[in-house]
Structures are given as structure tokens and as C-alpha cells.
């Protein structure tokens, strides 16, 4: 089984920070924020192992660009990534109730 190095774009990092900050400071729930952060770390570790085996995005434009997705293991978030030269690059993190493939496609234009 291949093991991948996982890197996060600045945008993906900013998106994750925004979700964590919202949970911690707007909803005032430190425990939930810590839980999402732990789930992010756990999902990232899993991504190192399974990145090449997960399905491509449904949106044709993202699929053509090689983007795949992984859902957080315990929360309703998703990472959009592609594999470039054997390295996993996460370019977006979204809540699964968002129209995340459309939002991400528009961001790429």
C-alpha cells in the first residue's frame, strides 16, 4: 500500500480555521471545536493511506482536474484534494451541506 505525504493549501487552512473559530467563538463550544480538530487530524492520517483509492468528484470539471474527496471520519466535513507527483494536496475543506463542488469549481475559475 502506498503512503502519501499530505499538504494543505493556504485556502484549505483558512477554511478549517474559520470552521474551528466559528464553533469555538460563535457557538462557544470548546469541546466541539477540539473534536472537529481531532477528527481533521485523524482524517488527514487516513488520507495518507487511502488517497489513491477514493472516488473522484462528481462534477465533471473537478473530475477532469483530478480532484477527489474524503469525508471526515466523524463529522460532516469534506476535503477536496488531488494527487500531484505522489503528493496529496488538499485545496478545499467544506461542510458537507454546502454545495462544495460548485463553490470550489467557481473558486478555480
List the model feature ranges, each with a label.
Residues 72-78, 82-109:
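Enriched for short, Lys/Arg-rich terminal
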Residues 20, 27, 48-55, 101:
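Short amphipathic alpha-helical interaction/hinge segments
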Amino acid at each position: 500500500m502506498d503512503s502519501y505525504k499530505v499538504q494543505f493549501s493556504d485556502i484549505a487552512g483558512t477554511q478549517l480555521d474559520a470552521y474551528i473559530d466559528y464553533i469555538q467563538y460563535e457557538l462557544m463550544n470548546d469541546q466541539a471545536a477540539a473534536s472537529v480538530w481531532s477528527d481533521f487530524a485523524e482524517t488527514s492520517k487516513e488520507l495518507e493511506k487511502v488517497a489513491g483509492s477514493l472516488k473522484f468528484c462528481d462534477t465533471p470539471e473537478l473530475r477532469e482536474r483530478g480532484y477527489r474527496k474524503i469525508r471526515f471520519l466523524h463529522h460532516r466535513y469534506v476535503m477536496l484534494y488531488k494527487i500531484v507527483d505522489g503528493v496529496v494536496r488538499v485545496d478545499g475543506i467544506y461542510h458537507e451541506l454546502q454545495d462544495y463542488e460548485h463553490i470550489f469549481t467557481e473558486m478555480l475559475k
